[in-house]
């Protein structure tokens, strides 16, 4: 068994909360494999390429990756080439604003925001 029933249900709950973000992202795809479970696949659409795949270990793992991607979108938007923990106050405010709808639905994962902002994985 790849995940317990409870683990898979929780991963699917996180997936549903981030469904629109997952659907719209040009940088990754979340796929199901009967062999290994959920796989986070780094991709590109212009040019088209497939890069690395990482197995999603838990709902917290998926939430971390999604929140990190939301924050990365803000950093790309501002054109600044630096790590999340070095975001300026305006970037930080926008990141937190974009995280809010997700964390409101997944409050048990709010600690992940602090982990991301401090550079912890």
Task: Annotate the PLM regions.
Residues 119-121:
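Short acidic DE-rich linear segments
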Residues 1-29:
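Negatively charged, low-complexity tracts enriched in Asp/Glu with abundant Ser/Thr
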Residues 5, 20, 93-95, 117:
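Intrinsically disordered, low-complexity regions enriched in serine, threonine, proline
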Residues 32-106:
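Acidic, low-complexity, intrinsically disordered interaction modules
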